[in-house]
């Protein structure tokens, strides 16, 4: 594959509908991934500003092409789905996110929109609140007693953390106010004081446990513990500032400000900095004052939230898809400091991604000592943003530069500016490595991507464990008794470094002595070796899938296997295609044949050729092939009753396994799909068939029992 410079993202006005559709798909996937990292994993991967830029471009494209708007788009949803491990809780009133303002003008525009919507001549009273950087929480009280606590989750469904919340001293188990609704959902933010965070991290480090990146992550991670005792040991705090369902309000003509006072009477801690403003100037003055005090505050804030004070106005204003019209968040710029970038190191992730990391002269940013900063990728170093537009006015980053570092969103240290006046005249530009620093294999960058990846999939130590886990997975070699746990153990001991090593374990066991391992004995070792031997004969599609080539899943592996038919033909074609690679592209007949396979295309074809262009991969595969036999593909029949038909299997099958049914259908020339559509020809329904059966009936698709299917295929 040829490395190509990332081109600037096209102006939205110039986007065609097909290109807009592709970019929306890319943006939605990126945002969903970052939402999961933030809301589920408590480990954000990019700065708030970069995330906000992705969202703004998504929303702008959707505004131009409203017909491409999807109900599942991040612009229409909030947060991320609840993580596994906690019971799910449905919020009676959704916990939506807030729209953002990034300038004084945008705050003024927010107030003007409110006035126009309500047809007011005067500016309505606005409550200004510090935006606490923590974890949103909803508390349900019935007859004044706490009955349930839930995280925000995706805004509609959260995680039940009631037991953990009962350990937080700031949260009353019984409301104390004179007037208490029969049922109410009270909301706020779980957070950790800065000095408590530093003390916790010190204890974690001394104990050899994970240290947290910032107070927000520590608060979220502490609350979402399966062991309540761990949560109880953590110094969590809570500010109350909102509510959801209320069976009745505890006052006549309620306002935001009055409700906050009631929350204080009920036993909650309410932020003492909250201020009632009567003009845009008042609101902006509060923003600047609290911003100046930010470093001295005992807790982290990342902005100010403005809310219309009168609740009847809030009710009239209502909501847009994912945020209220009556509130907006005014974000702070990140805290910054100046230091020297001493070195750029390259880290290799488990998927082979080469990620540059800046090693800095230690500097304090926002009260935290920073020594490293993310550089994201080659484009970021060169001064090119994630959307192709210039970063830092297009100025690149070099080893030895004096740089401005910020903790973006008080989370991830990031280089935002280079001080060019201090750059030595002879300082060379940084050259991103085109070889993996771990294994020496060449690195490749796909067109349209910013990431360079190591192509030494089978031999790179940085990727080895994940690749080996994939190699023995169910759809690959599927070796009984050799799962993830065993792979990790054998790799740590140096016994299995590449796939061929699995098949030489038996021959080496006189030296290794697997039977001496804890949990093993002569019988279990004998059974393991028998299971390995049983997989010395493998179907071509399973082998191709097992190689872990990027973009080659189960379906593409089958397409390749059917096209080439045998391992010898496949290898000869791949070697010829790899030899045809040139800086100008690949015009070899072998590559064109690969690229023209129905369902493959450029992206998959280039990934396959990159794999075989790396000699170390070929060497590892040759070593594997000396230990196994690859079975030729049984060509699908074309003269059967189901040849060319699309079939979906659903429900519990009793006469064959799902894999057996799928394989039999494919041998007879049918295409097996995972979902029902108008293009589906048959749905084979077993016991307890659910939504797929219902959809098939709604669409008029032919539904067969197992017996009817067997009769059809003879």
Curated annotation (Swiss-Prot):
<dbReference type="GO" id="GO:0046872">
    <property type="term" value="F:metal ion binding"/>
</dbReference>
<protein>
    <recommendedName>
        <fullName>DNA ligase</fullName>
        <ecNumber>6.5.1.2</ecNumber>
    </recommendedName>
</protein>
<dbReference type="GO" id="GO:0006281">
    <property type="term" value="P:DNA repair"/>
</dbReference>
<keyword id="KW-0460">Magnesium</keyword>
<dbReference type="Pfam" id="PF12826">
    <property type="entry name" value="HHH_2"/>
</dbReference>
<dbReference type="InterPro" id="IPR012340">
    <property type="entry name" value="NA-bd_OB-fold"/>
</dbReference>
<keyword id="KW-0234">DNA repair</keyword>
<feature type="active site" description="N6-AMP-lysine intermediate">
    <location>
        <position position="131"/>
    </location>
</feature>
<dbReference type="InterPro" id="IPR033136">
    <property type="entry name" value="DNA_ligase_CS"/>
</dbReference>
<dbReference type="InterPro" id="IPR013840">
    <property type="entry name" value="DNAligase_N"/>
</dbReference>
<feature type="binding site">
    <location>
        <position position="436"/>
    </location>
    <ligand>
        <name>Zn(2+)</name>
    </ligand>
</feature>
<feature type="binding site">
    <location>
        <position position="460"/>
    </location>
    <ligand>
        <name>Zn(2+)</name>
    </ligand>
</feature>
<keyword id="KW-0436">Ligase</keyword>
<feature type="binding site">
    <location>
        <position position="331"/>
    </location>
    <ligand>
        <name>NAD(+)</name>
    </ligand>
</feature>
<dbReference type="Pfam" id="PF01653">
    <property type="entry name" value="DNA_ligase_aden"/>
</dbReference>
<dbReference type="InterPro" id="IPR001357">
    <property type="entry name" value="BRCT_dom"/>
</dbReference>
<keyword id="KW-0520">NAD</keyword>
<dbReference type="InterPro" id="IPR036420">
    <property type="entry name" value="BRCT_dom_sf"/>
</dbReference>
<feature type="binding site">
    <location>
        <begin position="97"/>
        <end position="98"/>
    </location>
    <ligand>
        <name>NAD(+)</name>
    </ligand>
</feature>
<feature type="binding site">
    <location>
        <position position="152"/>
    </location>
    <ligand>
        <name>NAD(+)</name>
    </ligand>
</feature>
<dbReference type="InterPro" id="IPR010994">
    <property type="entry name" value="RuvA_2-like"/>
</dbReference>
<keyword id="KW-0464">Manganese</keyword>
<feature type="binding site">
    <location>
        <position position="439"/>
    </location>
    <ligand>
        <name>Zn(2+)</name>
    </ligand>
</feature>
<comment type="function">
    <text>DNA ligase that catalyzes the formation of phosphodiester linkages between 5'-phosphoryl and 3'-hydroxyl groups in double-stranded DNA using NAD as a coenzyme and as the energy source for the reaction. It is essential for DNA replication and repair of damaged DNA.</text>
</comment>
<dbReference type="GO" id="GO:0006260">
    <property type="term" value="P:DNA replication"/>
</dbReference>
<dbReference type="InterPro" id="IPR041663">
    <property type="entry name" value="DisA/LigA_HHH"/>
</dbReference>
<dbReference type="Pfam" id="PF03120">
    <property type="entry name" value="DNA_ligase_OB"/>
</dbReference>
<feature type="binding site">
    <location>
        <position position="129"/>
    </location>
    <ligand>
        <name>NAD(+)</name>
    </ligand>
</feature>
<dbReference type="InterPro" id="IPR018239">
    <property type="entry name" value="DNA_ligase_AS"/>
</dbReference>
<dbReference type="InterPro" id="IPR001679">
    <property type="entry name" value="DNA_ligase"/>
</dbReference>
<feature type="binding site">
    <location>
        <position position="454"/>
    </location>
    <ligand>
        <name>Zn(2+)</name>
    </ligand>
</feature>
<keyword id="KW-0479">Metal-binding</keyword>
<keyword id="KW-0227">DNA damage</keyword>
<keyword id="KW-0235">DNA replication</keyword>
<dbReference type="GO" id="GO:0005829">
    <property type="term" value="C:cytosol"/>
</dbReference>
<dbReference type="InterPro" id="IPR004150">
    <property type="entry name" value="NAD_DNA_ligase_OB"/>
</dbReference>
<feature type="binding site">
    <location>
        <begin position="48"/>
        <end position="52"/>
    </location>
    <ligand>
        <name>NAD(+)</name>
    </ligand>
</feature>
<comment type="similarity">
    <text>Belongs to the NAD-dependent DNA ligase family. LigA subfamily.</text>
</comment>
<feature type="binding site">
    <location>
        <position position="307"/>
    </location>
    <ligand>
        <name>NAD(+)</name>
    </ligand>
</feature>
<feature type="binding site">
    <location>
        <position position="189"/>
    </location>
    <ligand>
        <name>NAD(+)</name>
    </ligand>
</feature>
<feature type="domain" description="BRCT">
    <location>
        <begin position="637"/>
        <end position="714"/>
    </location>
</feature>
<dbReference type="InterPro" id="IPR013839">
    <property type="entry name" value="DNAligase_adenylation"/>
</dbReference>
């Amino acid at each position: 594959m040829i490395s190509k410079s990332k081109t600037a993202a096209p102006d939205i006005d110039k986007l065609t509908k097909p290109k807009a559709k592709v970019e929306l798909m890319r943006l939605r996937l990126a945002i969903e991934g970052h939402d999961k990292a933030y809301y589920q994993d408590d480990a954000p991967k990019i700065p708030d500003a970069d995330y906000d830029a992705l969202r703004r471009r998504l929303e702008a494209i959707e505004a131009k092409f409203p017909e491409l708007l999807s109900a599942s788009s991040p612009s229409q949803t909030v947060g991320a789905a609840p993580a596994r491990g906690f019971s799910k809780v449905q919020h009676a009133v959704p916990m939506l996110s807030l729209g953002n303002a990034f300038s004084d003008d945008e705050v003024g525009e927010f107030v003007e929109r409110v006035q126009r919507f309500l047809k007011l001549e005067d500016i309505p009273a606005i409550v200004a609140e510090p935006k606490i950087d923590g974890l949103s929480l909803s508390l349900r009280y019935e007859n004044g007693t706490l009955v349930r606590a839930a995280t925000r989750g995706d805004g509609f469904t959260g995680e039940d953390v009631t037991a953990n919340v009962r350990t937080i001293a700031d949260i009353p188990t019984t409301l104390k106010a004179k007037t208490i609704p029969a049922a109410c959902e009270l909301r706020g933010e779980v957070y950790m004081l800065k000095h408590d965070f530093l003390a916790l991290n010190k204890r974690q480090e001394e104990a050899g446990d994970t240290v947290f990146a910032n107070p927000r992550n520590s608060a979220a991670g502490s609350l979402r513990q399966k062991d309540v005792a761990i949560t109880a040991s953590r110094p969590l705090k809570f500010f109350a500032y909102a509510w959801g369902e209320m069976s009745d309000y505890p006052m006549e003509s309620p306002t935001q400000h009055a409700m906050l006072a009631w929350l204080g009477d009920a036993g909650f801690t309410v932020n003492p900095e909250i201020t009632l403003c009567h003009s845009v100037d008042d609101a902006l003055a509060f923003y600047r004052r609290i911003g100046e005090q930010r470093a001295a505050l005992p807790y982290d804030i990342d902005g100010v939230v403005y809310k219309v004070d009168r609740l009847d106005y809030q009710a009239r204003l209502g909501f847009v898809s994912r945020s209220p019209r009556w509130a907006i968040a005014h974000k702070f710029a990140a805290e910054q400091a100046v230091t020297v970038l001493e070195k750029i190191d390259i880290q290799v992730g488990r998927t082979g991604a080469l990620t540059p990391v800046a090693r800095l002269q230690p500097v304090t940013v926002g009260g935290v000592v920073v020594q490293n900063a993310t550089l994201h990728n080659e484009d970021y170093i060169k001064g090119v943003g994630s959307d192709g537009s210039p970063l830092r006015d297009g100025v690149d980053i070099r080893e030895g530069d004096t740089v401005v570092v910020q903790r973006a969103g008080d989370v991830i240290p990031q280089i935002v500016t280079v001080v060019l006046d201090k750059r030595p005249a002879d300082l060379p530009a940084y050259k991103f490595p085109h070889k993996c620093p771990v294994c020496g294999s060449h690195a490749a960058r796909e067109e349209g991507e910013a990431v360079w990846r190591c192509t030494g999939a089978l031999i790179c130590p940085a990727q080895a464990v994940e690749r080996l886990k994939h190699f023995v997975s169910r759809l690959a070699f599927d070796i009984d008794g050799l799962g993830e746990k065993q792979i990790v153990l054998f790799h740590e001991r140096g016994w299995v470094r590449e796939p061929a090593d699995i098949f030489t374990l038996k021959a080496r066991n006189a030296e290794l002595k697997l039977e001496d391992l804890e949990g093993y004995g002569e019988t279990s070792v004998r059974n393991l070796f028998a299971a390995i031997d049983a997989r010395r004969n493998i179907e071509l599609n399973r082998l191709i899938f097992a190689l872990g080539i990027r973009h080659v899943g189960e379906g593409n592996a089958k397409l390749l296997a059917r096209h080439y038919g045998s391992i010898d033909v496949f290898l000869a074609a791949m070697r010829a295609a790899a030899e045809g690679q040139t800086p100008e592209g690949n015009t070899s007949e072998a590559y064109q044949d690969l690229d023209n396979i129905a369902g493959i295309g450029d992206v998959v074809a280039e990934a396959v050729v990159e794999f075989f262009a790396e000699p170390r991969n070929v060497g590892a595969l040759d070593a594997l092939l000396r230990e196994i036999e690859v079975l030729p593909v049984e060509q699908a029949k074309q003269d059967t009753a189901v040849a060319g038909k699309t079939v979906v299997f659903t429900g519990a099958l009793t006469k064959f396994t799902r894999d057996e049914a799928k394989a039999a259908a494919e041998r007879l020339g049918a295409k097996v799909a995972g979902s029902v559509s108008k293009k589906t020809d048959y749905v084979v329904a077993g016991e307890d068939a659910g939504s797929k059966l219902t959809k098939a009936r709604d669409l008029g698709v032919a539904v067969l029992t197992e017996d009817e299917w067997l009769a059809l295929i003879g």
